[in-house]
């Protein structure tokens, strides 16, 4: 099991020093690469997950077709599920065209994981359809899902800890206050393939931004499979 950790929200400014909240997400299926990419992969597709640290944890993901044939996403059977509230993917796709060599880097916004490897131009389109095609060796991005419009709070959890030293809350899988499920139904050669990845928060940390300055901007293995990815606001 990998622990995926990202800056979830900037809390506020106190004496010109920003407080931040860091959320650790665990997943039984999503992996963290050496390059800090959160991804799932099978023989048909690779799914990369992005958390936009500048927009209150805006959630996006890409599906890369690893085959030479077209595959399709069944939008009516694909969902973003945030703490039990389901949102379908209808009208939320953006096309990214990539080449066979996957050699160069393409940045997508301010996301934690933000590179596509491509040797061709990148095109973006919006679409509203029941089925969305992904050509062979291409990728499509789905974006616009908000995890929350505020940081996590609970009674006794200090938002502005003394001198900025970390204030910590930990949870097990069953009691997690944040559970995100990404369910995708692919049509491959006329057959349905359902991919479901769950990510759940197991730790929240409130602290001054500069407390974590030493880890910025790379992911580092701090032991016990804990990965911290820190970005400035």
Predicted segments with their positions:
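C-terminal motif of bacterial Sec signal peptides marking the signal peptidase cleavage site
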Residues: 12-15
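Bacterial signal peptide processing site
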Residues: 17-21
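Asparagine-centered strand-capping/turn motif at beta-strand->loop junctions
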Residues: 61-70, 82
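Short, hydrophobic/aromatic beta-strand segments
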Residues: 69-77
